[in-house]
A protein has these predicted regions:
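Generic N-terminal amphipathic, Lys/Arg-enriched alpha-helix
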Residues: 4-20, 266-272
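Glycine-rich nucleotide/cofactor/substrate-binding loop typically near the N-terminus or early
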Residues: 80, 249, 258
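Extended, intrinsically disordered, low-complexity segments
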Residues: 255-298
Length: 298
């Protein structure tokens, strides 16, 4: 059932839970997420980020996500994640995304406001919800270093990358954005060390603004950290890294087990369709697990 982002997030706010937002990189990830949604009976958000364009073009992603969203028996939003420009967001709207994110977080504050205002005006005219970002959410690299999320604009980083509650209040007031991604210590990717989360900051921001708050970099946190963040005001949690990692691990284990058995017996080979099914099942189980965590009420 295809719905807009605002509908899902307003429901999550009322219930004091969070909705999972899962990046889609191929047919199998969409299949896994929607199967998990139906089996748990919970709404989900499927989203596409341009960082995954080497694997899946945005136009193909839109067709895949819209197909699965319409045939799934629970509410599903189709979201553009980390739109880097006005033009990218407009492309998402034309392709049928029910919500878009304009990520101008690496721009100066006033420029972030102006670009977000432009996207909100155009998107709302098409009944499309808009998420924006304030603060700096970093991406973890394999060597342990970090890079800032968002678009390719190069600006000086502020001393405090976390979202300021008063700045968030003014940002939402001026932009009329439907959801706000905030920075409080999470990062995209795999954590090499335990993240230092300022969960109290989430509560402070929640007191200042009424729109749903979004957590990026959800993979790798504990159940307690997720649930405290939700209790403090998070309504949408982006999750992809570990879902993808578990799928790869399941496929690797199956191949290794088959190769070991083949050395001693007449073991049937592993075909590509076997790998696909194994990956879908592994992702589905992980998505079901985090959906249940996000949906637990206080």
């Amino acid at each position: 059932m295809l719905v807009c982002l605002s509908e899902i997030l307003k429901s999550a706010q009322r219930k004091k839970i969070a909705c999972g937002a899962f990046n889609i990189t191929n047919w199998q990830t969409a299949q896994a997420v929607c199967k998990a949604a139906e089996e748990t009976g919970k709404a989900v958000i499927m989203e596409y980020a341009s960082v995954h364009s080497p694997f899946l073009e945005i136009s193909d992603a839109a067709e895949i996500m819209l197909y699965f969203a319409r045939k799934t028996k629970v509410p599903v939003a189709v979201h553009l994640d980390h739109g880097s420009s006005f033009e990218v967001c407009m492309q998402g709207i034309r392709l049928g995304f029910t919500s878009v994110m304009i990520d101008a977080s690496t721009l100066p504050y006033e420029d972030n406001i102006r670009l977000t205002q432009d996207v909100v005006r155009a998107a709302h005219a098409a009944n499309v919800s808009v998420e924006a970002e304030l603060g700096r959410i970093f991406t973890l690299q394999a060597d342990g270093s970090t890079t800032a999320s968002g678009n390719a604009h190069k600006t000086a980083q502020t001393e405090n990358p976390y979202t300021d509650p008063q700045a968030a209040r003014e940002f939402v007031k001026q932009t009329k954005v439907d959801a706000l991604a905030i920075a409080f210590g999470t990062a995209h990717g795999i954590y090499n060390t335990k993240p230092k989360l300022d969960l109290g900051l989430v509560k402070k921001i929640r007191k200042e603004i009424k729109v749903p708050l979004v957590m990026h970099g959800g993979s790798g946190l504990t159940k307690a950290e997720f649930q405290t963040a939700i209790q403090n005001g998070i309504s949408k949690i982006n999750y992809y890294t570990y879902m993808s990692l578990y799928a790869a691990q399941a496929v690797k284990e199956k191949i290794n087990k088959t190769e070991t058995a083949s050395a001693n017996t007449e073991q049937a080979p592993v075909f590509f369709h076997d790998i696909s099914a194994i990956a879908v099942e592994a992702m589905k189980q992980d998505v079901k697990k985090v959906i249940e965590i996000f949906s637990e009420t206080p």
